[in-house]
Regions:
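Arg/Lys-rich, positively charged N-terminal/basic patches that mediate binding to nucleic acids
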Residues: 1-34
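Solvent-exposed interaction patches of small proteins and small membrane subunits
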Residues: 32, 57, 93-96
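Enriched for short, Lys/Arg-rich terminal
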Residues: 69-70, 74-99
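Conserved amphipathic alpha-helical interaction elements at protein-protein interfaces in regulatory
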Residues: 23, 43-46
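Conserved N-terminal glycine/acidic-rich loop preference
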Residues: 9-17, 51, 68-70, 92-94
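Basic/aromatic recognition patch in beta-strand/loop cores that engages polyanionic ligands
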Residues: 38-39, 46, 50-79
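Residue-level recognition of specific faces of alpha-helices
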Residues: 13, 40-43, 62, 84
Length: 99
């Protein structure tokens, strides 16, 4: 089984999204989002090819967690590296600097 690695940027992105969701919608919404993230990560670990490749870079896959958040990752035989969790409400061109 591949090792799951979150980059520093991905950790910061998740922290920011968790804090935003909790402040705007409450702890229950934060927990629901965390469960969706965990479910998505489990699916990626089982089958990293499950999600489509990014239009910006064919070596990077994207997993839509919710319509407001997308997780970007790469993988090798040994590991899955989560690069970023992008808030899709941002200007779309901003993702280019993250992946």
């Amino acid at each position: 089984m591949r090792k799951l690695v979150l980059t520093t940027l991905a950790r910061e992105n998740l922290k920011d999204v968790f804090e935003f969701i909790e402040s705007e919608f409450g702890i229950n919404s934060r927990i629901k989002f965390a469960n969706k993230v965990n479910k998505s990560l489990n699916l990626i670990v089982i089958n990293p090819e499950l999600f489509p490749k990014s239009e910006l870079n064919v070596r990077i896959h994207k997993c839509v967690i919710t319509k407001q958040s997308t997780l970007y990752y790469t993988y090798t035989i040994k590991e899955i590296k989560v690069l970023s969790v992008f808030d899709t409400r941002q200007k779309p061109s901003k993702i280019k600097k993250f992946i």
